[in-house]
């Protein structure tokens, strides 16, 4: 079995954000995000070694194979969610929601203000992430909260807006005060990126809406 490895996407590292300092971004990107990349690659090497992760010894209570597969989900989703998070940040924000996105938000969540309030509530309530995404099965916009990279994820949810709510995302700037960090996050949304994600997500929904017969 070949070893699948990934590389960090350095071009996604944001700088000079409003209310989120470069000093905060530095450990978040270089230590946490890149740490997930490194551990994912390490796990892939071990999974490729049939002697190390002996499938014949797989066990639901404990086995090397089980532990590797669990941590694979944690580290890989840690990579993907961080890339989605960093990739949608721009200094002071950029653009605004497209007419198509605003209409969809109005239909599914009651408007932009209601959507923002829902996202902020999820960002306070959940320990890992708050996500606005498109459900590939229903075609509806949904607010999802995660307690960890791989806990409470909705299968088929395409993320549009992703808020990191782990303390490592704000501790340098705000210590244990999460609300001001969340307010700062909303000041730096690159709506051009979010609009593009929404367009692609809707195309994916149209292609897959009969996926479940």
From Swiss-Prot:
Chain positions recorded as Fe cation binding sites: 28, 82, 164, 168
Pfam families: Sod_Fe_C, Sod_Fe_N
Highest taxon in the source lineage: Bacteria
This protein's record includes keyword Metal-binding: yes
Cofactor(s) listed in the protein's UniProt record: Fe cation
Cofactor: binding details: Binds 1 Fe cation per subunit.
Assigned EC number: 1.15.1.1
UniProt keyword annotation of Metal-binding present: yes
Keyword annotations: Iron, Metal-binding, Oxidoreductase
Subunit structure: Homotetramer.
Role this protein plays: Destroys superoxide anion radicals which are normally produced within the cells and which are toxic to biological systems.
Name of this chain's protein: Superoxide dismutase [Fe]
Species this chain originates from: Aquifex aeolicus (strain VF5)
């Amino acid at each position: 079995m070949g070893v699948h490895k990934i590389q960090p996407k350095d071009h996604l590292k944001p700088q000079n954000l409003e209310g989120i300092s470069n000093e905060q971004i530095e450990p978040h990107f270089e230590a946490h995000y890149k740490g997930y990349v490194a551990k994912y690659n390490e796990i892939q090497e071990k999974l490729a070694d049939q002697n190390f992760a002996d499938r014949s010894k797989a066990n639901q209570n404990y086995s090397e194979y089980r532990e590797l597969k669990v941590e694979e989900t944690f580290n890989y989703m840690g990579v993907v969610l961080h890339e989605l998070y960093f990739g949608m940040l721009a200094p002071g924000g950029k653009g605004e929601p497209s007419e198509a996105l605003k209409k969809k938000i109005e239909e599914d969540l009651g408007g932009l203000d209601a959507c923002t309030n829902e996202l902020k509530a999820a960002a306070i309530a959940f320990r890992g992430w708050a996500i606005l995404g498109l459900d590939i099965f229903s075609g509806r916009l949904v607010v999802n909260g995660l307690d960890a990279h791989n806990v409470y994820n909705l299968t088929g949810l395409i993320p549009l807006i992703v808020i990191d709510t782990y303390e490592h995302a704000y501790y340098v700037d705000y210590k244990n005060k999460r609300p001001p960090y969340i307010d700062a996050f909303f000041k730096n949304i690159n709506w051009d990126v979010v609009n593009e994600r929404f367009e692609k997500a809707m195309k994916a929904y149209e292609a897959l809406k009969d996926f479940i017969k």
